[in-house]
């Protein structure tokens, strides 16, 4: 069995690849944002804000598309790559590498109520731009969902031609992820708790039981379970990661088993990665925690990562 590689992207210092006991840096000195799978065991990455790059199985990187727009996220449906921007647009990458804007996304009902998230810190208003934070599709490829921050989770069933809103805008969604096998199950991390859909993202229920705080920022599926991170707010000095069965209706419980009850800052959007029995969590403090036995035990793999932006296991 091939040992999986854990990729941890950072906003300022490239990307770090961990395979077994070895580790090395790639794209040094570059800003690497959202990572996503291309569906064939390779990684896609937003590099320096304007390039969509592909990592081959041997670790070599190539640029497959560029844009004048500030890029924020990507997702794949079949062989089609969709890219989100920091001005809340959706682009589709053509076979030639051109990025074509999906005009239908500009007509989402309620778009005029979207807003950029912000907070008052030391007398200054700070926060990310209004943008597309995550993109996902149901396992059968029928439904495309994007997480607008802040604008809910628009949903398309016709390849992005038309869109309908889901989840209240004020819920402040931070990440949306579709189940890798069951096309009905979708989860989202929001400032009001964990949101779960059992009809392909058409409707949602809110789960809060067991959380120490409601501000959820990252979600992932792992086998039959859901992982979700929570903190008091975006700038909290400590956070926690919880786990619960997809089919269960009980409390979310702290992961434990070597993953600290309180981690160093939040686990932000895209910073929980899972693949087979391997899981990885990167916190804002730059710690990377890894489990290779489906969460039976965890250990801290490294420290000092500079502003982690994304985790992907390939």
Give the label of every model feature segment:
Residues 1-314:
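Extracellular glycan-interacting surfaces
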């Amino acid at each position: 069995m091939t040992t999986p590689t854990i990729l941890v992207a950072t906003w300022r210092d490239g990307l770090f690849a961990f395979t077994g006991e070895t580790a090395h840096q790639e794209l040094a000195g570059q800003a690497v944002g959202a990572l996503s799978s291309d569906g064939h065991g390779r990684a896609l990455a937003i590099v320096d804000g304007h390039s969509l790059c592909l990592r081959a199985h041997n670790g070599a990187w190539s640029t497959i598309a560029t844009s004048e727009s500030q890029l924020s996220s990507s997702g794949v449906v079949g062989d089609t790559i969709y890219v989100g921007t920091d001005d809340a647009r959706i682009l589709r990458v053509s076979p030639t590498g051109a990025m074509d804007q999906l005009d239908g996304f500009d007509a989402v009902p309620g778009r005029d109520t979207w807003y950029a998230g912000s907070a008052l810190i030391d007398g200054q208003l700070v926060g990310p731009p209004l943008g597309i934070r995550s993109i996902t599709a149901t396992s059968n490829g029928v439904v495309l969902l994007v997480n607008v921050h802040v604008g809910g989770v628009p949903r398309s069933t016709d390849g992005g031609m038309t869109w309908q809103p889901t989840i209240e805008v004020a819920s402040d969604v931070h990440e949306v992820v579709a189940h890798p096998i069951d096309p009905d199950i979708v989860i989202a991390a929001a400032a009001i708790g964990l949101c779960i859909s059992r009809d392909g993202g058409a409707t949602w229920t809110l789960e809060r039981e067991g959380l120490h705080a409601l501000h959820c920022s990252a979600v992932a599926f792992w086998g039959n379970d859901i992982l979700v991170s929570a903190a008091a707010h975006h700038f909290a000095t400590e956070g926690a990661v919880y786990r619960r069965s997809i089919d269960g209706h009980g409390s979310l419980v702290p992961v434990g088993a070597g993953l600290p009850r309180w981690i160093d800052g939040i686990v932000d959007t895209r910073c929980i990665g899972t693949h087979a029995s391997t899981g990885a969590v990167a916190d804002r403090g730059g710690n990377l925690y890894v489990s290779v036995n489906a969460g039976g035990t965890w250990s801290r793999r490294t420290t000092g990562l500079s502003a982690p932006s994304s985790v992907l296991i390939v």
